[in-house]
Design a protein with these regions (language model features):
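Short, charged recognition helix plus adjacent turn
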Residues: 63, 69-101
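Short alpha-helical DNA-recognition segment
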Residues: 22-41
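The DNA-recognition helices of helix-turn-helix-type DNA-binding domains
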Residues: 35, 46, 61, 72-75
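Alpha-helical structural signal
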Residues: 14, 39-40, 65
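Short, basic-rich loop-to-helix N-cap that marks the start of a DNA-contacting helix
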Residues: 46-59
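Peripheral/terminal regions associated with large enzymatic or DNA-binding modules
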Residues: 5-6, 26, 59, 65-67
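A short, Lys/Arg-rich alpha-helix, primarily the initiator
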Residues: 1-23, 70
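Base-recognition residues in the alpha-helical recognition helix of bacterial helix-turn-helix
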Residues: 41-44, 70
């Protein structure tokens, strides 16, 4: 079952990765080989987890790159669904079969 309002994955990075190891933002950025600002933007929800950042998080803290990306996708979808009523599109055709990923 999908969460209706999942938290930004930056919170998981902060509380599940950095905090237990008592790492500061600067120390975490050094571990991940990113700028302090880039990590801070992720932690405060200004930036999302890219595929590259997911690999960095996987290598540094575990958790599987795919899982980090799924967390970001779930958050992004929940945010988009909040605005779904404002998205104006015209249906072109009905599908005979559902699209599968």
């Amino acid at each position: 079952m999908r969460m209706k309002n999942p938290p930004h994955p930056g919170l998981s990075v902060r509380y599940d990765c950095l905090k237990p190891l008592e790492l500061s933002v600067a120390e975490g950025a050094k571990v991940l080989d990113v700028t302090r600002q880039a990590l801070n933007n992720l932690l405060i929800g200004r930036a999302g987890i890219s595929a590259e950042m997911a690999i960095r998080l996987d290598k540094a803290f575990g958790g599987c790159a795919e899982t980090w990306l799924r967390m970001q996708a779930a958050y992004d979808l929940a945010q988009a669904e909040k605005k779904a009523g404002t998205i104006k599109v015209k249906r072109v055709a009905e599908r005979a079969e559902p699209v599968h990923a």
